[in-house]
Amino acid sequence: MHSRLKFLAYLHFICASSIFWPEFSSAQQQQQTVSLTEKIPLGAIFEQGTDDVQSAFKYAMLNHNLNVSSRRFELQAYVDVINTADAFKLSRLICNQFSRGVYSMLGAVSPDSFDTLHSYSNTFQMPFVTPWFPEKVLAPSSGLLDFAISMRPDYHQAIIDTIQYYGWQSIIYLYDSHDGLLRLQQIYQELKPGNETFRVQMVKRIANVTMAIEFLHTLEDLGRFSKKRIVLDCPAEMAKEIIVQHVRDIKLGRRTYHYLLSGLVMDNHWPSDVVEFGAINITGFRIVDSNRRAVRDFHDSRKRLEPSGQSQSQNAGGPNSLPAISAQAALMYDAVFVLVEAFNRILRKKPDQFRSNHLQRRSHGGSSSSSATGTNESSALLDCNTSKGWVTPWEQGEKISRVLRKVEIDGLSGEIRFDEDGRRINYTLHVVEMSVNSTLQQVAEWRDDAGLLPLHSHNYASSSRSASASTGDYDRNHTYIVSSLLEEPYLSLKQYTYGESLVGNDRFEGYCKDLADMLAAQLGIKYEIRLVQDGNYGAENQYAPGGWDGMVGELIRKEADIAISAMTITAERERVIDFSKPFMTLGISIMIKKPVKQTPGVFSFLNPLSQEIWISVILSYVGVSFVLYFVTRFPPYEWRIVRRPQADSTAQQPPGIIGGATLSEPQAHVPPVPPNEFTMLNSFWYSLAAFMQQGCDITPPSIAGRIAAAVWWFFTIILISSYTANLAAFLTVERMVAPIKTPEDLTMQTDVNYGTLLYGSTWEFFRRSQIGLHNKMWEYMNANQHHSVHTYDEGIRRVRQSKGKYALLVESPKNEYVNARPPCDTMKVGRNIDTKGFGVATPIGSPLRKRLNEAVLTLKENGELLRIRNKWWFDKTECNLDQETSTPNELSLSNVAGIYYILIGGLLLAVIVAIMEFFCRNKTPQLKSPGSNGSAGGVPGMLASSTYQRDSLSDAIMHSQAKLAMQASSEYDERLVGVELASNVRYQYSM
């Protein structure tokens, strides 16, 4: 209730700028320069406590005035809110409205105030449109034109038919006003003739809820276990409170009571958190059908106008729901547009119809004297305080009133038409029952021209149609009309050869044709297939006979007996026709263009590991190399002291002779050098060898170095094993990468557009869904309706031509069928978004429904439905359905080209580096011998030459051979000495 008041207050705020209130300036009125064809004043009078009706009036005014592109005029409203039924005060207020130059009156007042307003309306011939009034002062047979028109239809006959529908023989009538007593009189007069057993058991006028509960206690004392059928004729809020107090009262029973709410109170909001509403039998009437397009558009516009801060403070309908509009508010909203249509009709025939009146009223300036302006008295503003002894009616009042009776529009309360007496005709009421959580379930439909039409067989119903439906009796000799439409693979025209004549059902083939044959065999009936005339499945259409088009409309109009096609079972269709058990289960799926298979790249061998892992491996390699270098600096086991030979010992060792060269001996005074094998370059070389799982000449002897090496080995063996396993799959299996894989992907990207069939069942599913993902998809599709299509063929063509930039939301059977047909360039991705089914449709109450249900279940259990589906979907496929995508292929050169490139590049790099080293070595300048200048470092007799010669390529080779020979002929420490000696070798060549 609080959220509803907030919304009403918000509408009050947004409409204030478009509506003139009683406090207005006559000077501002005189400054207006627009013509009457652009502005028409209206007077409105409301009783206090009618906030929802006032808000509906203001919103209707705003809705019309904002429609600048199509409206012919603008409405101005002068609104008065009264809190008294005093006739004198009300008369002054009415006269004040007349003096403002209004063209019609609107409002909602109490029955006591209505009599005064009604009298003034007829006296001054001022049209008065109201959502409801109790009883007309003028009888229809009086022959006089009544200038008051009520938007609320007469529903006392609906009460009578509902009582008969439930089979009640007695009722208890509770009412709160004189109007209710008059309705009781009409009910009694209609029911009594020919139904002597019917009786009104008790009648009680109640003033408040307490009085009603006390009366119920009296009924309980008189007969606790007797059935009590109570017709409750009171406002909605009082009816709600009575029911709540009844259920909470432990002294009152529940199962023995059944309430029939006579007013249109079921359109009001009934909170779902009040569990008492579902604990007792409640039946009522609704005039606002939420499935009508006009009502949906009204609620959509209300959502757009709703403040964002109130979105979470709504009722239990959900965070995005809005309070239900009451019947009185809907009728007030329709009243404004009835007047708008009447003025449009007048201005279409004669655009300047009101121009003279407007100029004369403008020049009158609100004065009661017309002589000053030179205008005709009949054209002046209406004056209630005339002293002439007679009243002057408004000259346009009769014309407007007669045009009002000819208005035909579609409003929130359904089709709006009037008879010559101004009474609503051709209207529809919904008979609903309330269940748990205040859920309303429609059980029947009442029309003023057809009476009560049950939607389903009811326990209390005794109609022959319901009886036949329950027993399943049908005429087996009758040829039943089966409505369908052409859509592969469900139904198509059979291709015939030359000279072949196809007639009747033999002209068709497809899944639905086979299904119809099997159902006819199960039921033992004959049938004839007829294509639906408009080519539609069936949607609500106010311009179609019966309110629906397509196959649904044909079933409603009894033009067909059965409909077999790919028609989805929906709650909206179930309201007007019957469905069998689903013969096919499906869901909304995503169709995209099949992506081109990716050919392996040159460096496809890198694909098994992501880019992040490769970067991590490189960083790990560098890090381990640095760690090895540093941890081998500190332990003493990584260092070896070279034992240099002394002067006395060196003389005993003969110089080494290699290739005619004399190996000189080092000087005794050179200090010892502690060498370490793990230099920076050797550390990197060791880490690389371990990573490549190859050997290396050096190993860390220290514990720290070996720990570092061990963890690096463990790391590499796991990484190499994982890489090898993934590499096999990446190199031998070709893959297709789709841009969209799940429905969530659609909402998280902007490259791929998507849509569905406009106004189809998929469109309605997203519009009604309250799931967050579906809401995002609906907002996108509703804002980009150009991405949706009018036919599935158009959507499939767009998918194929979009180069992967368009996705179509289509039912899964259609998706699978198209994917299995040439050119085989589409595919289904992701899971189904919802679950629904196709069903065989029949008119409501058809005797075939029960047997069709049994037949469908039988065909499903024995596998016939699966067989014919495979026949039309997969057995005739011309595509491979991507079976090759999971089959390993032999490796081609393109799969491993990258490693050849690396091999060739590495070899070329090695050759280039070798050449560079050679030239750099040859360009090294000559070095003086340490002993050539007679210094202490000289060693006489070591070599004949006192200087190093530039080494030739053969010199370098002999240098390496000497080093290897000495390493192989000595122990570990002696090897180190040989290495040191080899590093100081001098060669002397004989010339």
Curated annotation (Swiss-Prot):
Q: Where are the transmembrane segments?
A: 612-632, 711-731, 896-916
Per the UniProt entry, the glycosylated residues are: N67, N195, N208, N281, N376, N385, N426, N437, N477
The record's subcellular locations are:
Cell membrane; Postsynaptic cell membrane
On tissue specificity, the annotation reads: Central nervous system.
Q: Name one GO molecular function term.
A: glutamate receptor activity
List where Polar residues composition bias occurs: 308-318
Give the Cytoplasmic membrane side ranges.
Answer: 633-710, 917-991
Question: Topological domains (Extracellular): residue ranges?
Answer: 28-611, 732-895
Q: Give the family, as the similarity comment puts it.
A: Belongs to the glutamate-gated ion channel (TC 1.A.10.1) family.
Task: Provide the protein name.
Answer: Glutamate receptor 1
Give the source species.
Answer: Drosophila melanogaster (Fruit fly)
